[in-house]
Amino acid sequence: MLNFEQFLKKIDQNYYENEFEVRYGQTVMNTLHRVWPEKYKQLSGGEYDCFYNDGLAESTLKLLQKEWK
């Protein structure tokens, strides 16, 4: 599994490859699903699910940083 810094780089890479097609929160959650599917399932549909709300992305990333394996 990637470390947290590599995860952030992967998010940025995915976001800029799909610029203007996918929102940042979507990119965070999609990347999380590929990298750590169990954590994605825990967050999906909850207060830290930033897929539909980019405003939650910062909080989601802070939580993930604390819980990263």
Language model segments and positions:
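C-terminal alpha-helical interaction appendages
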Residues: 1-69
